């Protein structure tokens, strides 16, 4: 009989229990920081109607979503799909429940999303996202753009990274205004895509892509100069103004970006730069956009990203629900932490105690001991069976912080000792 291949599908991650424990610990610490900053936990379904997911996404998203077809229908007829992020489902959630919600709503979500991207090192097709979003009704102060970034920065500080994280921040209105001022609105979609991919390809390919869409030498020079602008507020604002493009949208974007930078400084955040390469690939962003990187490991790409979206719910309601949010890509983050050895992965054990009966005679009392430990909020297992004690203890040391050996003496005295593993 031919055996079935048991390897996981390419782009999907699975972990051994002790590694999963570290993954879960990081997820827990992120959730704790989100709560500390006033975000309330919610959950939305992993399966949504395709028309919901594609209402505003645009770009490459339609090519990347996983449609779900029932047994009796073709993929062309499928009307449901797996979510590709938490933000679009959140907008539907807001519209569905707006009469029962208080605004601004600070929402935290942690769960799996799916994208049909090409599987590669550090990138996954099934991945955990840890999101924070602030949603307003009719308006939302720029304060919350900084609030989201500060919350995410604090989350990264919670699990002992051995390298600093850096936020790269921009504002979509700046590029939109720049293109309007240069009368390049009709080529905006192409230019956004070229800029978004500019760090993933050699510089000459970026230049060639701009040539292919018919930019003049002067237009190309301005766009290339624009995307190379990064640094502090004063440097970037001056550089953009020196391009000589006048446009109200451009001015508004610069004003907003300056205000967000000032709020970040007021919140004692110094690990950020303004960077005009940051545009974000999803079309629903309208203002502030940001990505977090590990500067010493740029090859892994961003480990967090987000931005402001004014009109995400416009396809679902006439009411305005502006929002700003960000997401930590937990699988990508976990991959780089383990691959680059940027965190201590040996310290976390899945369980608190392993109860080890020497023989079957001690099984009953071992269960009593386990229940007693669980009543103290400990995670406990009993390692039963006829293996040698030494083998059982090796197993216990792998999965638990400590062990309790149960033999005849312990059963008779109803007393036991906890052996802690170093």
Provide a role label for each language-model segment.
Residues 1-84, 88, 146, 150, ...:
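TRNA-binding/sensing appendages of the translation machinery
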Residues 5, 58-63, 180, 184, ...:
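Short alpha-helix boundary/capping motifs
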Residues 11, 89, 151, 174-178, ...:
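A general alpha-helix detector
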Residues 19-37, 48-49, 76-77, 85-101, ...:
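Positively charged, Gly/Ser-enriched RNA/tRNA-binding surfaces
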Residues 44-63, 166-181, 279-286, 388-399:
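Beta-rich nucleic-acid/ligand-interaction surfaces
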Residues 54-68, 186-188, 294-296, 399-407:
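Short, structured secondary-structure boundary patches
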Residues 63-74, 183-210, 294:
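Acidic, His- and aromatic-enriched active-site or binding-groove loops in soluble protein domains
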Residues 178-185, 217, 244:
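Phosphate-rich ligand and nucleic-acid binding surfaces
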